[in-house]
Amino acid sequence: QNGEKISKSKGNGLSVEEWLNYGSPESLSLFMYTQPRRAKRLFFDVIPKTVDEYFTYLGKIAECDDASLLENPAWHIHKGTPMAIKLPVSFNLLLNLAGVCVAEDNEVMWSYVEKYAPGVTPETHPHLDKLIKYAVTFYKDRVRPNKLYRFANTEEKTYLKDLKDALSKLF
């Protein structure tokens, strides 16, 4: 990540088990599938990008003809039987949402997702439900312990009061 040697004892490395706490086994398969002969840097920021890439490939399955199916990594990861899945929100968005709404459980996340995408539920989108679980776990393990809060300074309090007054006039 920073051009330094990866070392778990330094805390800048990532094990397979840690990946599987925050991302699906299929996303790890995609990470390993791309450029298999090249050394890879395994760090936490790679997980959201790879999870989103994996679901992008799954979303393209329905549009693929037989020739382009072979070029889609999802086809190989699922041994020729991938499901075409399109998600209403990306994993990156879920991670951002988890940090903003202080997601302590899946229900908090689902309340926001259902407002954003009406009709989307854990039952209709089980893959999204798994991603929400990963996002909540990521928030609890990686974001919350490092989150620092501070009181607003005088200038910020003035701006926040002005914003509150402006919004109260709208509603």
Residue ranges and their predicted role:
Residues K115-F171:
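Basic, alpha-helical terminal appendages of large translation-related enzymes
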